[in-house]
From Swiss-Prot:
Belongs to the ribulokinase family. This is Ribulokinase. It comes from Pectobacterium atrosepticum (strain SCRI 1043 / ATCC BAA-672) (Erwinia carotovora subsp. atroseptica). It catalyses: D-ribulose + ATP = D-ribulose 5-phosphate + ADP + H(+); L-ribulose + ATP = L-ribulose 5-phosphate + ADP + H(+). It is an enzyme of class 2 (transferase). Gene3D superfamilies: 1.20.58.2240, 3.30.420.40.
Length: 561
């Protein structure tokens, strides 16, 4: 091991990028910085009412540069010279179109303000019809079912659906793009100066979970499948977009001299391969096989790794993919998740906060006080409900406010609130929201277990997991499992730093690096036996409402409405 070696993990989230410097020997988190995307904060290029969420590539470039420079500036000179690697994770699927030089189209003047030329954020659901078309073709019998290793359902949140939607909608982008790239693959390519689309290393994680890549059909689906889906996919796009994939501990190259100078780090820094945030966060959390890791934020991503021998040739239905090496080499990475978790709470806060916002407009002198009240709304709701957590009249809420990711992805679904009466107050309704997110978490756990994939432990990480013990206790009671809370609140960036340590040769493999660098457990929550029984009844009612409500959002039903 290199004495004093330091790696930097870059974690690209929905709102911001985090840079974290980690000591590769002790695992000590040395310095960190978070930078919010400026254009995103202004709401540019997004239309929430139409489910359109886009990120301009300059938001990523400017923010990563600022974050790393701040982190590096806080290190000693010796520490700066000891930086030997950078690892990258990002949200996903978050792809963007690129030209022959590997440049994101939005970085060209003629596309600078075109949302279709930017990164299509994971939670963008403009491609629902395109996802339906992919699913229909996979089930038509004309081709093998290319969805069988991704749970049997292709989502509008994923790679090909988004490519197809933009290609159909925007002829200029369609003609200019020769390929598309995931954010987690683009950042290492950018920093290492890899430009030609054919030379860019594509990560196993993103390719296997979102791009229909699988060894059994030698990579991506064949060209005739894409042509049958829509000829626009074969007009100008290179085929195949890529063939080989790499696990994230593999190096993709060294940082360019220009970027090393801009960031103030050595030119010898190695770039690790990219992967999705939650898969990388699982490594940062130190997870072992058959531990269900819940990465909880605006949404959740649930990751479990399993032995290749145990999964064998079985396919696990209703999840978001089973990919060899997507988390740790030589293990199958299984992905699931909820399309909204913290976003549901935030929506409820905005709903109640509307009157405060209006009052601030009418009384500017009270604006600061009213904004402070609004910022405390969810905290007070949670505290109030926790003091009197009645379950006798708890509303049943379906956690589909941003569609459903697992089990069985369906982004047509909408949130549902039931069992209200004239006595339902705001804290009680918020309690229903908390229970709904916990019910969704249990449905994911059962999706694994009912198909013979054991869940031996449950870990939770992220801001909500560490800062909201009330919410986590509800999850514990609903799932009727001990719930371990991971100590680090930046596990994704930590995991990226772990991958960088292996890529740079500091550690020989991921398990060894985890022993030195992974986070510990902060505390373990235990189920309350009395509340477990009552939540069981409520969960059964939640499942009943799920069965009743889902048909109302079928394509034929929504068309009639």
């Amino acid at each position: 091991m290199s004495a004093g070696a330091i790696t930097i993990g870059l974690d690209f989230g929905s709102d911001s990028v985090r840079a974290l410097a980690v000591d590769c020997q002790s695992g000590k988190e040395l310095e960190t910085d978070v930078v919010y995307y400026p254009r995103w904060r202004e709401g540019k290029y997004c239309q929430p009412a139409n489910n359109q969420f886009r990120h301009h590539p300059l938001d990523y470039i400017e923010s990563l540069e600022q974050a790393i420079k701040v982190v590096v500036s806080r290190l000693t000179n010796d520490q700066r010279q000891s930086i030997i690697g950078i690892g990258v994770d990002s949200t996903g699927s978050t792809p963007a179109p690129i030209d022959e030089q590997g440049q994101i189209l939005a970085l060209r003047p003629e596309f600078a303000n075109n949302p279709n030329a930017m990164f299509v954020l994971w939670k963008d659901h403009t491609a629902i019809e395109e996802a339906d078309a992919i699913n229909a073709l996979c089930r038509s019998g004309q081709f093998p079912d290319y969805t069988r290793y991704i749970g049997g359902v292709y989502s509008s949140e994923w790679f090909w659906a988004k490519i197809l939607h933009v290609s159909r909608e925007d002829a200029a982008v369609r003609q200019a793009a020769v390929s598309w790239i995931e954010l987690c693959d683009w950042v290492p390519a950018l920093l290492s100066g890899t430009q030609a689309p054919a030379d860019i290393r594509r990560g196993r994680c993103s390719a296997g979970h979102k791009s229909l890549w699988h060894p059994s059909w030698c990579g991506l689906p064949p060209k005739d499948f894409l042509h049958a889906l829509d000829p626009c996919l074969t007009e100008t796009l290179q085929y195949p977009l890529f063939t080989d994939t790499w696990t994230a501990e593999q190096p993709v190259g060294s940082i360019t001299a220009e970027w090393a100078q801009r960031l103030g780090i050595p030119e010898t820094v190695t770039l690790a391969g990219g992967a999705f945030d939650c898969h990388v966060g699982t490594v940062g959390a130190g997870a072992q096989p058959y531990t269900l890791v819940k990465v909880i934020g605006t949404s959740t991503c649930d990751i479990l790794i399993a032995d290749e021998e145990r999964i064998a040739d079985r396919t696990i239905a209703g999840i978001c993919g089973q990919v060899d090496g997507s988390v740790v080499p030589n293990y199958i990475g299984l992905e699931a998740g909820q399309s909204a978790f913290g976003d549901m709470y935030a929506w409820f806060g905005r709903l109640l906060g509307w009157s405060l916002q209006e009052a601030a407009k009418d009384h500017p002198e009270l604006k600061t006080s009213l904004q402070a009240m609004e910022a405390k709304l969810l905290e007070r709701l949670t505290h109030n409900w926790a003091e009197n957590p009645t379950l006798d009249h708890l509303p049943i809420v379906l956690d589909w406010f941003n569609g459903r990711r697992t089990p069985f992805a369906n982004q047509r679904l909408k949130g549902v609130i039931t069992d209200l009466n004239l006595g339902t107050d705001a804290p009680t309704l918020f309690g229903g929201f908390i229970a709904a997110t916990a019910f969704g978490a249990r449905a994911i756990m059962e999706c694994f277990e009912e198909q013979g994939v054991p869940v031996e432990n449950v870990l939770a990480l992220g801001g909500i997991a560490r800062k909201s013990p009330v919410i986590m206790q509800v999850c514990t009671d609903v799932m009727n499992r001990p719930l371990q809370i991971v100590a680090s609140d930046q596990c994704c960036a930590l995991g990226a730093a772990i991958f960088a340590a292996v890529a740079a040769g500091v550690h020989g493999d991921i398990p060894t690096a985890q022993q030195h660098m992974a986070s510990g457990i902060e505390r373990t929550l235990m189920p309350d036996s009395q509340r477990v029984a009552r939540y069981q009844q409520l969960y059964e009612r939640y499942q009943q409402w799920c069965r009743l409500a889902e048909p109302a959002y079928s394509p034929t039903s929504t068309a009639k409405n």
